[in-house]
Amino acid sequence: LVSFISSLNILLFVPTLSFSHIAFNGNIADELIDRGHNVTIVLSSVDDTVKSNGTNRAEILRIDVGISNGLLTRSLWQNPGPYEDSSPLNPLILAKLLRVSSIFVKACTEIASNTPLIDYLNKKKFDVGIVEQYDYCGFGIFSTLGIPSTVWISATAVYRLQPEALGVNYPLSYVPELFAHVDDRMSLMGKLENVLVATVTEMVSTFYSSIEETKVFRRLGVLAKSETLKDVSRRSHSIVLNAMPIFDIPMPISSQIVHVGGITVNERSETQLNTDWLSIVNQPNDGFFLITFGAIAKTRDMPPSMSRSFNEAFAFFSNLTFIVKDEDVPKGMIERRGRNVVRTSWLPQMALMAHPKFRAIITHGGWSSILESIYAERPMILMPLFADHAKNSQVVRAKGVGVLIDKMRVTTTVLIDSIREITENTR
């Protein structure tokens, strides 16, 4: 028997926005490599604090795009910070989105005019280009290289402008915008909020990022005067989402939209826990909770009143253990605080979730943590902080697998009631 294998040369264009986005792109690269394809990843280094490449199996080209150290991190997570009002309707957030967009435009200008890089990539003769939803620059790079097929991906749930580029309309009357604090049963005021959030985010994406980056490629002669990067995005062959239709708000769909939710979730293995962790989780009590707010929001940055509310709520449930991700704990150390609180700078999260005494996670509504909780078959208490956390948390509440709390209204009583809801009601 003779078998024929057709290997494609595939280019992923990945700005280093955050670890979760890098991980999603890395998982896609690994899946493609497993199927015999040749994968190159161009990492546009917009954030120097993100050191991960997502994979060590693909060819990695990490490109310095002239962004000063820590600039994107400061722009994203300060003034206001993650524990403050982060609605896109907050003028400070709009200003922040515009600052971040200007960073991406600068990075795009640098990478598009990097002649040695473009010459090297041209020699690779790529068949497919893959780019994520938050930056149009990749479409310009693919046009520069003459890549015939493009795939538009999202490490989160779907961003409305993606399906709409392919002709699938998402009615704002019942489909929540990715950054909006509403579900599909919106009140009149909820619908108004949804429309306003959609207007603000689309303005930043289309009328700033897309237009400014389009100018970059027009100056280089890649795009005609009448053509925009948004036009190029409409020629995408498919959209790949890190989402699951069964765990989302009902919305229009297309055969061009592919769902791969859970691709970033590693298999559980209780044997991954060392003796120190086993001595903590195997205590003769009612189990343990995990508390983590992702890689960006630091526990130390919590307002004192919020931190005090958490500590008082933990003390109320003396027969539960609360394991808190705390960046101030020395690396590799596990510190016990009080009778039932453990703090550490790093959590073996999936291994802890696989343990039978794991009760629930208190977290920020990041999509990766939600998918891991679903995989572990455990409920959640979600306190959305920014970006897509709002919509993610609304989905969790709508599906009945978690409790949603408002970060602007956190009190000891709210936290106690939320924990009691999880421990006393089967989900």
PLM regions: where:
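Glycosyltransferase specificity loop/lid
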Residues: 2-221, 228, 247, 256-288, ...
